[in-house]
Every structure is written in structure tokens, then in C-alpha cells.
Amino acid sequence: MTIGLSVTNDVFARDILTVAQLNQAVGQLLERSIPSLWVRGEISNFTQAASGHWYFTLKDSRAAVRTVMFRSRAAQVGFVPRPGDQVEVRARVSLYEPRGDYQLQADGMRRAGVGNLYEAFLRLKAQLQDEGLFDPQRKRQPARLPRAIGVVTSLHAAALRDVLSALARRAPQVPVIIYPAPVQGADAAARLAARVAQANQRAEVDTLLLVRGGGSIEDLWSFNDEALAREVAASDIPVISGVGHETDFTIVDFVADLRAPTPTAAAELACVPRGDLLAALRHTAERLARAQQRRLDQAAQRLDRAAAMLTSPAQRLAHQQERLNTLRHRLASAWRGPQGRRVARLDMLAQRLAHRRPDTGRAAERSAALLAQLGRAQARLAAARQARLDTLAAQLRALDPQHTLARGYAIVRDAAGAIVTDATRLAARDRIEIAVARGRIGADVTDIGTPDGTDGNPALRRG
């Protein structure tokens, strides 16, 4: 790197400088002229002060430079370096004026080689994205009510304890199957991929959690493996990834069906809390009860309307009888009224004609025959109307509940007054009322039977 230094400070135009003035001017020159840069070297003389600041020397085979990293920046590094560690430090060049020593003021640190790892991460991410493995349309929602939940992680990982604790708290009724595999190391990625494939082959879970706790980029590198990513993408079981902390992203997070910021969050996404399920069941039961009650109310209204049409068959019969009597009276009045007078006049005229014409006798006979036919026709009409009235009366009597009771039947009502049509609705010692043709009977239930001869439902009996 070539850095051009331009000294324009008026301080250097003076004839004589104090040591403090010189160090201050050199410090300002260094800070203004050299930008923030990355420096690779080996950690030595590392000290973590009580204040939280880090002091160490960064060296290689030919040179060394003192370095300081203040607490706020050190807290953002995912590891505590040790002497001998190869690291890459992002820093600004500054001067420690009291001693005139130049130093590095670091604001970032990573293990040496992380830059290469990150470049490999970006290359694989771009490749899989171009293949469509990150496409949201190919991702599936985990089952809302899983039969069982699978967990792929190390048996010794703290993440496993967190997941099991969250699942036991939220969904204790859901079985959990663990597919153990190391989460870091040379063969970790291959063994994790094998466990994902095994879970799909066994098909015993509805949701698969792939989890591990936080760590450095090297610790999480198994989850950036291409073979593991492709196995997760090809999984028939929805996969929820929960790798590291919220700020950590791995290739597996992009191909998984759902990404959780932590292992605990992955467990929470995998199941609905038991309390929410119970509340939903109660709500559904209430809706069913209301719907059933509406149907019962509608049926009761239809029954009431039907009963209103048959409230008093005897009254309808009396009305028809009254109408028949009226017709009989009108028929009798007709014979006593103008029609009777016409018949009498006809008889008189017939007698007079009989004396005046020789054929009046035959006319009288024909007239008498016609009168007889008229009488028979009127009698048949009256008989037909009487038969029709008798038929209607018989039909009305058949619909009269009192008529049914008179044939030996009875109506049974429970303590609430509802008619009992199903014996299994009652229980032993229930109070009932029995209506018969003449009166009512109060009774207590002693035994219950069903139409097939078996005893009633034992669950409805009282001990």
C-alpha cells in the first residue's frame, strides 16, 4: 500500500517544537493520512483489563505493533483471543502521545481466514439462490398440530435443553424424537445431513428442528455446507432452522422452510401453545352448542305451529256437525216452504186435469214418478254429505291426542316438562310425569331399557 503524506500543519513551520507539540502533530498526521484498514498478525501479550478494554501486541515474523480495543468494541467480538491466535484486526493508526509510541486502535476482530470463509459463504449463497432453493413459494408452513416433532442436534448441546424445555412448556402432549449428530467438527455437516435424510425415511415426525447454539463463524460453519443445505431443501418434512443467535445467518437458514433466531424460538414456532388449543376447543364447543340450540329452538317452533293446527279436533268436529245440522234444517225448510207449496199445487192441478182429460192419469203417474226420483236424489245427496262428514269426523278423532291416550297410550314428560321420546335421556331416580286418558301420574325412574332390549347407557345412571 502506498500512502502519500502531505504535511501542511503550521506547527512544522516553527523553529522549535516541544516534545508534546511534536507528538500531537504526528498523531494528527497519522490519523488524517491513514484510513481504517485490516491488519493480519499473531496475538501476544494479551491483557483484558478490569475496565473491559483489551491490550495486546499484533506481530508477525518481522515486526510488532501495540494494539488497543476498547470495551464497547471488544464486546462485539464473538470470542476472546489467546496468545498465539492468528487474527485479522480492523483498526486505525494512532499515536500514544505520552510515550510517542504509535499503535493500532482496533474496532473489529476476526480469526484469520474468516475473510476466505465469508467469500465462500457468499459464493454458495448466490449459487443456491440462482437455483431457486431460497424461493419463498417452495417453502411450506409447519404443521399446526404435529403428531411428533423431530430435533436434529447434539445430545450435549445447550440448544437441545432449551428446545426440550420450550416444547414441554408449550406442548407437553406432543412426542419429541431426537436425531443426534455433532454440530461442529470435520464430519459434522455430513452427519447432520444423514440425520435429516433418516428423519425423512422414517417419516415419524411432522416437523423437523435443526438447531445449535451460538458461536464463531468457524463453529457455525457446518451449517454452511452445500450437501447439508441441499438435504434440507429436499426434505419432505418442513424444516425449522434455529442456528446461533439472532444476528447469525447460515446457508441452512435460507433453504429451511422457516428460520428462527434461536433454538428456543424454533421450538416455539413448531407448536401451538396448549392453552391456545384448549381455548380454541372451548370456542368451537360453544359454537356447536349454540348451533344445536338454534336447531332445537327451530324444531320446537315448528312443533308448536303443528300443534296449533290440532289444538282441538273436537271443536272442528263440532263445527262440522253444526254445519250438517244447518244443511238438514235448510233441506227440511225447503220442503215446508215454496217447494212444498209447489208440490201441493201440482197435486191439485193434476186432480183437476184428471177430470178434464183422459190422459191426465198418465201425466199424474209421470209426475209422481218424477217427484219420487227427486226425493231419492235429495236423499242420496244428503246421505253422501253425511258420509263425507262422518269420514272427516273420524279423521279428526284419529288426530286427537286424547283419542290416542284413550287407546292405552301415554305421554311421558321429564322434570322440565319436555316430552320424553328417548329412554336413554333419563337416569335412575329421575322424576317423570305420565299423562293417560284420564289424569296424570307422577313417577320415579327405576330402570331404563332400549328398543333392542339392552340396558340404557350406564353413563347416564346415577349410583
From Swiss-Prot:
Superkingdom assignment: Bacteria
UniProt KW keywords: Cytoplasm, Exonuclease, Hydrolase, Nuclease
GO cellular component, one term: exodeoxyribonuclease VII complex
Broad class of where this protein is predominantly found: cytoplasm
Subcellular location: Cytoplasm
A Pfam family per the record: Exonuc_VII_L
Reactions that this protein is recorded to catalyse: Exonucleolytic cleavage in either 5'- to 3'- or 3'- to 5'-direction to yield nucleoside 5'-phosphates
GO biological process, one term: DNA catabolic process
Gene Ontology molecular function, alphabetical: exodeoxyribonuclease VII activity; nucleic acid binding
Protein's UniProt keywords contain Nuclease: yes
Keyword Ribonucleoprotein in annotation: no
Role description: Bidirectionally degrades single-stranded DNA into large acid-insoluble oligonucleotides, which are then degraded further into small acid-soluble oligonucleotides.
Subunit structure: Heterooligomer composed of large and small subunits.
NCBIfam families assigned: xseA
Family indicated by similarity: Belongs to the XseA family.
Protein name as catalogued: Exodeoxyribonuclease 7 large subunit
UniProt lineage: Bacteria, Pseudomonadati, Pseudomonadota, Betaproteobacteria, Burkholderiales
